[in-house]
Every structure is written in structure tokens, then in C-alpha cells.
Amino acid sequence: SVGFKAGVKEYKLTYYTPEYKTKDTDILAAFRVTPQPGVPPEEAGAAVAAESSTGTWTTVWTDGLTSLDRYKGRCYHIEPVPGEEDQFIAYVAYPLXLFEEGSVTNMLTSIVGNVFGFKALRALRLEDXRIPTSYIKTFQGPPHGIQVERDKLNKYGRPLLGCTIKPKLGLSAKNYGRAVYECLRGGLDFTKDDENVNSQPFMRWRDRFLFCAEALXKAQAETGEIKGHYLNATAGTCEEMYKRAIFARELGAPIVMHDYLTGGFTANTSLAHYCRDNGLLLHIHRAMHAVIDRQKNHGMHFRVLAKALRMSGGDHIHAGTVVGKLEGERDITLGFVDLLRDDFIEKDRSRGIYFTQDWVSLPGVLPVASGGIHVWHMPALTEIFGDDSVLQFGGGTLGHPWGNAPGAVANRVALEACVQARNEGRDLAAEGNEIIRXASKXSPELAAACEVWKEIRFNFKAVDTL
């Protein structure tokens, strides 16, 4: 009989369409799918496409009230993952009309919403997504971007230097401001609130902002350089977050900070708009990212979170170090670093980039290398990250035996030496240690730092592999 037929049918009949030609306006996603035993990969891929777009588990008569062909997600290609028995990469295309303009929140709710709890799958991971230019154009993106930031700070031709103030919790506002002043006075460009410094009983946010502003003004007057401190505006409500950002602007601070995953994309996008409207730079910390991106077969790869952040807005974002104490495999890290900085990125599976991405001049984001790095890493960091980056040494500045300012001096001298050596055409990878040693002859601060950290190694295998 014609008409409506109730019951359960296989997803692949509707949602697996290998003959589909993707459109320039489609959002494309590459999922790593691990089906339950007995579930064919086509069915698993189709289930992902269905459950993250128009499908549900049974046939419903209201399907007849719309055009599924126009709105459904489609699994258009499946390939086995080399070296893994039961894993497949399923490529899904979503029509643009499924997403609200300018909302990272809505995009993620659709693509990585309910479907990750789906029973027919043992595990599911979103490896990469291709955002069409027409959708990117609905986002403001980073408040300022790399070039505007350099112009604001008047710093060119080298990476920027930062330092997270430690101990991360427990200092009073006055002592905190003192530590900030010493680091900036010694030669750093930025100091940073730790991601969990918000407004706790031992140091309320307003007091911290005031003492940090004093430190900035003093260090700028003495060095003749523009200085910044990432004032963490993250708060329990958006209203409170705005209050902090407004106060930072009133103090004349150049930059504020936000924890974009714990704070949420809605709050982050609001703050990014405020920052562009009011001339504040926005530093983004990725606290909680490893909860989402650490497992190889389930969750979301950081490159997706990085793309989402560039759309939502931020001028700096933490991106691993390749050499320090936290995650990062070199090629994969550089893959998403390029996704953050460049205007156009070619598909390159060896770096984990599944799709060619065109950002249509959306401003870029500076990657921040932070976590367990010290002066001996400087040549490698300069070579790996290049000029458009922020190198952040927390313990690697404050752990200096003579104090914060000498620690900052050591880092600045090491950086300038590496940049000069690179500009002279020397090979930083091969001659790095020699370059640092030569520079330490003329700088007692650097010599002392070299002595302290000469034996430190973090010898663990990288978890983030292809």
C-alpha cells in the first residue's frame, strides 16, 4: 500500500549515500566510528549522520511534512582506519540550513550532541570538520587577530614571551601584583592569571585587577615596552564576566582572558564581541580540553575545538608545546597550529588534517606554547612555532634561583639569541644548545637558568597520534 508505513528501518537506506557529491556550502565532518560487534560500518556511519541531523529511531509520520532530502545529514564515504581492526572513518555532510548563523553552540549541539551516547556504537570521535566559507562569514571570529595585536603591542619579528604566575592559588593580591611586575620588568611581554584564578576568598578579582594594573603601568614606564597581563574574566555568570571585562578596560589593561570550554561557547562569543568593540585582546585557555580530546577513539580531537574557538573568537589559545610536560605530537600539533594562524590550509592526512579549510580572511589566533618548558627548549620552540606564537614559561621563569626578574631576563636573552641565530641562517635544531651556551656567557641570569634546568626531561610517549 502507498502512504505511511510504521516500524523500524535501517538507517543506511536513507542516510548512507555513497554517490552524493558534497556541496561547497555543506559542513563536512570526519568521524572515527567503532561499531558494536555485528553492526556493519555503513549502518554505523548512517546512524551517526541520522542521529546528528534529522533522524530518529523509528519512522514518524511527521517526516512527510518536510523534505528529508533537503535537510538530512548524509554519510557519503567510509574508509577503514589502517592498523585498527574495527574502526572506520565515516564522512558526513550536513546541509548548511541545519545550523543557526553565528552560533558555535548550535553547530556543536548538532554535530556532537546526542549521537555520542548512541548504543549501536562502541565509541565515536570527531576527528575534523570542514566549515564552509558561507558559514564562517556569519562569525566575527577573533576580536583582533595576529597583525592587529602586533600593531597594538608594537612588537615584531619574534615570538612573544609570557609567564603564568605561580603558585596558581593562594597569593594575596598585593604579592601577586609584585610577581607580575618583576616578570614584566625583567623582559617578558605578558604575564598570566592561572586558569583557575577567578575570584576566590584569598584574592578577590577587583583587588587583583588593581594591583596588576599598577604593575603594568610601572613596568611599562621603566622598560619603554608595552606590557600585558591576562586578567581572567571567567566567572560564574555572563553578567559577572562582563563586569570584570569592563573594569579591565577602565583600568587601561590591554588584554583579558577566558576559559572557553568551562565557560562555554556562548559566553566566549559574547566576550569576544565585547573585546572587539572595546579594543581588548582576548587570551583563551583550554582548561577541560583533555576530558574531550585525550581518548583516541572517543570524543573530539583538539583541532575541532581549535576551529570552533577561531569561529567563536580569541586572540591567543593554548596549543601544547611538542617539547614540554603536556600533550603534543609534532606534526599533529603543527597541523592545528596552522589551522589557527593561516588563512588557507590544505588537506594533509599525515598531519591529521582531513579537509582543506578556507578561513576567508577571518583573523588568525596566536598559538600559546605552555607547560613544562624552560630555556633549553627555546631553540626548538622558536623553530617549531615560528614568530607568530606566545611562548609561556611559568615555572621556567619563576623557578629561577635568583627570582622572577632574573628568570624573565634569562628567557628574553635566550629568545633574542635564538631569533638572531635563525635570522643568520643557523640550524636551531642542530645548534640549539650551542646557541644557548654562547648567549649565557654574556648573561649571568641565563647561565644560572641553564644550570638549574640542564637535566630536566619529560620522557613519556605522546598520546596524540594518528
UniProtKB/Swiss-Prot annotation:
Catalytic reaction(s) noted: 2 (2R)-3-phosphoglycerate + 2 H(+) = D-ribulose 1,5-bisphosphate + CO2 + H2O; D-ribulose 1,5-bisphosphate + O2 = 2-phosphoglycolate + (2R)-3-phosphoglycerate + 2 H(+)
Organism superkingdom: Eukaryota
Family annotation (InterPro entries): RuBisCO, RuBisCo_large_chain_AS, RuBisCO_lsu_C, RuBisCO_lsu_C_sf, RuBisCO_lsu_fd_N, RuBisCO_lsu_N_sf, RuBisCO_lsuI
Broad enzyme group: lyase
Positions of post-translational N6-carboxylysine modification: K192
Any one cellular-component term (Gene Ontology): chloroplast
Cofactor list: Mg(2+)
Note in the entry: The basic functional RuBisCO is composed of a large chain homodimer in a 'head-to-tail' conformation. In form I RuBisCO this homodimer is arranged in a barrel-like tetramer with the small subunits forming a tetrameric 'cap' on each end of the 'barrel'.
Keywords for the protein's UniProt record, in alphabetical order: Calvin cycle, Carbon dioxide fixation, Chloroplast, Disulfide bond, Lyase, Magnesium, Metal-binding, Methylation, Monooxygenase, Oxidoreductase, Photorespiration, Photosynthesis, Plastid
Subunit structure: Heterohexadecamer of 8 large chains and 8 small chains; disulfide-linked. The disulfide link is formed within the large subunit homodimers.
Name of the gene: rbcL
Marked site positions, Transition state stabilizer: K325
Note on cofactor: Binds 1 Mg(2+) ion per subunit.
Residues with N6,N6,N6-trimethyllysine modification: K5
GO MF, any single term: ribulose-bisphosphate carboxylase activity
Main subcellular location of this protein, as a coarse class: plastid
Keyword Cell inner membrane (UniProt): no
Protein name according to UniProt: Ribulose bisphosphate carboxylase large chain
Organism: Beaumontia grandiflora
